[in-house]
Structures are given as structure tokens and as C-alpha cells.
Amino acid sequence: MKKLARLTALLLTGALLLALTACGAAPLAPEQQAKQWLLGEINSYRATLEFAPLEEVKQLSDAEQIWVEQFRAAGKTELPESTTNETHQKWASMTGNWTRCDTFGLGVKKDASGELIDILLAKVPANTPEGKAELSEALNHHAFNLSACTRIGIAVVTIDGQMYWTCSVYS
């Protein structure tokens, strides 16, 4: 009887593991889905140029995430540079050993008083034909058109219901 109970328990455990495996991993959060979609689209574009795909490097994506988290915390897409200096220093310390080719999605402008303002520029387009056309236009940016650059740090953030993204490309 004990052997039958043990066998039944083993079979049930195996069936449970099989069911969990069949279900797959937990679904990705929308920002993570967008990030994976963007990276796939970038690499599809680079394949048409016969360039190597961009490999995401966790340390570099963590550095990009530092930027977007500051915008998320403020709930804004524009922040005075005086409030982002510490973030920039942290980003620089995380990326300092890498050769940066270019950055996309993060810009700077001057306000009326002459103060520099950091801005999140790139909205994540919808995964529709129109959105893909919009992204295709964005992929003409210098950052994605350098064959020697093969590493990327990328981050996505949602602010007021709109997703934005930024990335830096490295050799």
C-alpha cells in the first residue's frame, strides 16, 4: 500500500511538473514585452543591412533603466538637467568601460531660461502596420546603422499611459 501511495505521489508530481512546463513561464509585463519586440524589430532591420544583431547586455540595460526610472518617478518626459546630474553620473559609471556608438530616445533641449532639459523622445509605437512604419523610420537613426556596434542597453517606461523607450548602442 505504501509503495502504491509513493508511486501515485510521484506520478502526480510528474504530471504537475509537465502541466507547469506546458503552461510556460509567467507572461512578461507590458514594458518587458515592448522591449523584446523593439529589440526584435531592431535586429530584423539590422539583418536587412547584413549587420550582426545587437546583443542586449544586462549592465547596459540596467544603466538605461536608471534614466527611465527617474522619468517614471517624476511622472514626466522632461526633467531639468539640474535634477538628473546624479543619474547621469551613475549611468556614466555603469557604462564607462564600454565604447558608446550612439544613443536613441533621450535628448536635451534648453528651456526659456537657458537651463538644459533632459527629454524622453521616443514613444513605443503600436505593434501594427502603422506602428511598424513609424519604427522603421526611427531605425534610420545613426545608432542602429553602425556595423561595428553589436551591444545594446535598452529600457522602456510608461508615463501617463504612454510607453517610451531609450537605448544606447556600444561596440
Regions found by a protein language model. Give the residues of each.
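A well-ordered secondary-structure block
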Residues: 85-171
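Enrichment for repetitive, rod-forming helical segments
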Residues: 10-13, 53
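Generic surface-pattern signal
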Residues: 13, 47, 69, 73-76, ...
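C-terminal motif of bacterial Sec signal peptides marking the signal peptidase cleavage site
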Residues: 19-22
